[in-house]
């Protein structure tokens, strides 16, 4: 299969890959940041995941990121791994400029005030409780990773070792 893939590097170092799909009127803007839980320290985990949540808290010029995207007929989501954090927007192709504008704005002017940070800390701590503490064998993945990667940063889960790390961040 021969895909019409184009790779570009902008003057600011941003690497882009463009793959047109003529069979859809939708566009996906997918951004991968080269940061994940591997970049954390054992005594302070879950922060890459916390930052993923903070990226949806609005910015200087776009107080409601999801609101603007939804008005343009789109949606977004994100996830964090050991190696990178992925953010994506899906919206009608004619509104692609909206996604580029709001992604640029949140990268340059993310809202990081105390209120926004505390709200997202609570959300991530609750997510930790739901997925790790309040579920049968919810901590099994913690144990498996710690056994498999005894000295590597992959030994802690992306959500963190303990909710206290996020609470104290």
Where in the sequence are the language-model features?
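M16/insulysin-pitrilysin zinc metalloprotease superfamily fold
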Residues: 57-59, 90-123
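Histidine-acidic residue clusters that define the catalytic metal-binding segment
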Residues: 1-7, 145-169
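M16/MPP (pitrilysin/insulinase) zinc-metallopeptidase core fold and M16-derived inactive scaffolds
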Residues: 23, 28-93, 97, 134, ...
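Short acidic/His-enriched helical or mixed secondary-structure segments at domain edges of catalytic enzymes
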Residues: 125-143
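N- or domain-start disorder-to-order transition segments that initiate the globular core
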Residues: 1-25
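Hydrophobic face of alpha-helices
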Residues: 48, 66, 100, 117-121, ...
């Amino acid at each position: 299969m021969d895909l019409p893939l184009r790779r570009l590097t902008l003057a600011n170092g941003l690497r882009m890959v463009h793959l047109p799909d003529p069979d859809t009127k939708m566009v996906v803007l997918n951004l991968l940041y080269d940061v994940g839980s591997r970049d954390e320290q054992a005594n302070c985990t879950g922060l890459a995941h916390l930052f993923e949540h903070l990226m949806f808290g609005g910015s200087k010029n776009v107080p409601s990121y999801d609101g603007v995207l939804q008005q343009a007929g789109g949606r977004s989501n994100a996830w964090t791994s050991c190696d990178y954090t992925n953010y994506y927007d899906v919206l009608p192709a004619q509104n692609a400029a909206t996604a580029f504008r709001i992604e640029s704005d949140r990268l340059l002017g993310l809202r990081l005030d105390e209120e926004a940070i505390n709200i997202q800390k609570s959300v991530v701590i609750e997510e930790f409780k739901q997925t790790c503490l309040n579920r049968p064998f919810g901590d099994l993945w913690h144990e498996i990773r710690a056994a498999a990667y005894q000295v590597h940063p992959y030994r802690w889960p992306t959500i963190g070792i303990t909710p206290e790390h996020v609470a104290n961040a």
